[in-house]
């Protein structure tokens, strides 16, 4: 009995223990299904329970794994705390486990209202920061685009022309582009008492037309107009020498009428439509030309000529220009005319520049003996300036700005950019002898040397300077024009066989046409070497103001 009763008691205890165990598991499952019991369970695990179960650690540490194993848990969280906006959904899903545990620890099992402020406080700054990071770059970008577009628009617009008269606005010389039916200034204005002084104004210059500034195909009417203007200006120069205004005006009118008549004859000699005024006759023709004249006051100026003026004052041509295939001829052919200015300030910097120029000219002389060797001149230029920079840097003063560069193409480019005379033409002045003016005589009466492939040109200039430079300034131009005409008459008369006439000017009839041919082909561009040429006089040549007879020697032929 005792044994049986003990066995029954043990079985009863086991049954009770089994029943209690099943009830505990069911209660545990029910507690996990409710959010209130969930928070309480987490609270108990955090403070009173032994080491938390693996499932609870995964919730605290790895919420992504928990979301896979417990989908109802996150669904329940969304029901309790819905997101304020669709943009906040990823923020709440990421940060929910992080803010969940501290709130539960501090406030107890069910405190969703206290968790809401924390959730609302943290995400908005994060979203606001993202907006600040994205928006500011967009605004400067718009500003940059506006700044870049506006200058481009302004650069594309032509600036307003100045109100002052521009001599190059109506310039025909060297013109490029579309040509019209007439040259600028054609037909010329008819001489009258109103424009008499302007026509004979010594400072008034005119454009000489020829193949260099007129199209050679398809515009023969422009060539006829240019020839008429050339002949007209030649006649004007002759008439303006008359001392009486009455005789001068009568001469100008006859020259103008004769030029217009010859123009119409040339118009009818070709099978093209003639000028509309040429269809008339007599006074009606002249009145038509007078009415069609674009500038009856003769205020048109010629194209601005970019000339290198004579050296004024002691100026040192430093740094020298970079030798190139284009200027190597000037380097060699004009070397004997390049004189170093005198009376320079005795400063160390200028003396070092002068020493460099003197050394460079010596090297140029060696290179020119090799047949205008461009490579030799370039190496001499580079070596001379490198040596100059070595001396500059050896002194504790401010060296030349280009010497701050090391020996490199950058230094060479710096010196070449600062060269005042890159073509080595400092003392070369291009003169136009087609119209003798007081300014022209002022340039010819100075010390200089003429460079021309035509040997008769230096003789002409010497006759003009010897006989006219001693006269009063107002009379020099008239004297020079008379000497020019006399010299042309002499060349086409007794000395006709002493020189070659490539343009066949002497075959034309004397007076205006012949003189115009000389002006166009021989006297338009004459190079004059200005300054002191004393060092070059011992080479078998004399300057225009030194010597007594510069006429071409009989029998001397020149190309």
UniProtKB/Swiss-Prot annotation:
Q: According to the UniProt entry, which residues carry Phosphoserine?
A: 556
Q: Where is this region: 2 X approximate repeats?
A: 170-424
Subcellular localization is given as:
Secreted, Extracellular space, Extracellular matrix
Q: Matching InterPro entries, A to Z?
A: ECM1, Serum_albumin-like
What tissues harbor this protein?
Answer: Expressed in the surrounding connective tissues of developing long bones, but not in the cartilage. The long isoform is expressed in a number of tissues including liver, heart and lungs. The short isoform is expressed in skin and cartilage-containing tissues such as tail and front paw. No expression is found in brain.
Q: Where are the sequence repeats?
A: 170-298, 302-424
A single Pfam family it belongs to is ECM1
Give the UniProt record's GO annotations in the biological process aspect.
Answer: angiogenesis; biomineral tissue development; chondrocyte development; endochondral bone growth; inflammatory response; negative regulation of bone mineralization; negative regulation of cytokine-mediated signaling pathway; negative regulation of peptidase activity
> In its UniProt entry, what is this protein called?
Extracellular matrix protein 1
This chain is encoded by the gene named: Ecm1
């Amino acid at each position: 009995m005792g044994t049986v009763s003990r066995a029954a008691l043990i079985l009863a205890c086991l049954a009770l223990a089994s029943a209690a165990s099943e009830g505990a598991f069911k209660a545990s499952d029910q507690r996990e299904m409710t959010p209130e019991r969930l928070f309480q369970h987490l609270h108990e695990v955090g403070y009173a329970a032994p080491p938390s179960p693996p499932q609870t650690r995964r919730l605290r540490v790895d919420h992504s794994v928990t979301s896979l194993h417990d989908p109802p848990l996150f669904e329940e969280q969304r029901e309790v705390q819905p997101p304020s906006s669709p943009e906040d959904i990823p923020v709440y899903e990421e940060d929910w486990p992080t803010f969940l545990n501290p709130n539960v620890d501090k406030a107890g099992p069910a405190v969703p209202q206290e968790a809401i402020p924390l959730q609302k406080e943290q995400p908005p700054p994060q979203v606001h920061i993202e907006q600040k990071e994205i928006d500011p770059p967009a605004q400067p970008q718009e500003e940059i685009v506006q700044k870049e577009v506006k200058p481009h628009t302004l650069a594309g617009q032509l600036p307003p022309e100045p109100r002052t008269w521009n001599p190059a606005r109506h310039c025909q010389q060297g013109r490029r582009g579309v040509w019209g039916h007439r040259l600028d200034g054609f037909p010329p204005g008819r001489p009258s008492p109103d424009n008499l002084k302007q026509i004979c104004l010594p400072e008034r210059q005119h454009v000489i037309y020829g193949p260099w500034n007129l199209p050679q195909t398809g515009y023969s009417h422009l060539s006829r107009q240019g020839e008429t203007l050339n002949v007209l200006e030649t006649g004007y120069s002759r008439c303006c020498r008359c001392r009486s205004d009455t005789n001068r005006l009568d001469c100008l009118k006859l020259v103008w009428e004769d030029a217009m008549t010859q123009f119409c004859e040339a118009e009818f000699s070709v099978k093209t439509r003639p000028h509309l005024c040429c269809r008339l006759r007599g006074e009606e023709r002249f009145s038509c030309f007078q009415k069609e004249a674009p500038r009856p006051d003769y205020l048109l100026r010629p194209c601005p000529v970019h000339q290198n003026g004579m050296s004024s004052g002691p100026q040192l041509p430093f740094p020298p220009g970079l030798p190139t295939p284009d200027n190597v001829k000037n380097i060699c052919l004009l070397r004997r005319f390049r004189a170093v200015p005198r009376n320079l300030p005795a400063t160390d910097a200028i003396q070092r520049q002068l020493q460099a120029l003197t050394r460079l000219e010596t090297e140029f002389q060696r290179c020119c003996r090799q047949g205008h060797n461009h490579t030799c001149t370039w190496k001499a230029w580079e070596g001379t300036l490198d040596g100059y920079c070595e001396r500059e840097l050896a002194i504790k003063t401010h060296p030349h700005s280009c010497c701050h560069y090391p020996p490199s193409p950058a230094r060479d480019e710096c010196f070449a950019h600062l060269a005042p005379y890159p073509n080595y033409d400092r003392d070369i002045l291009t003169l136009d002898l087609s119209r003798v003016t007081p300014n022209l005589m002022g340039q010819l009466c100075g010390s200089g040397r003429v460079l021309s492939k035509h040997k008769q040109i230096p003789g002409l200039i010497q006759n003009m300077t010897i006989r006219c430079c001693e006269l009063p300034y107002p009379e020099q131009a008239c004297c020079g024009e008379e000497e020019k005409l006399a010299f042309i008459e002499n060349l086409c008369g007794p000395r006709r066989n002493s020189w070659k006439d490539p343009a066949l000017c002497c075959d034309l009839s004397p007076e205006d046409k012949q003189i115009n041919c000389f002006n166009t082909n021989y006297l338009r561009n004459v190079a004059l070497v200005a300054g002191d040429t004393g060092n070059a006089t011992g080479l078998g040549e004399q300057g225009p103001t030194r010597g007594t007879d510069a006429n071409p020697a009989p029998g001397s032929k020149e190309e």
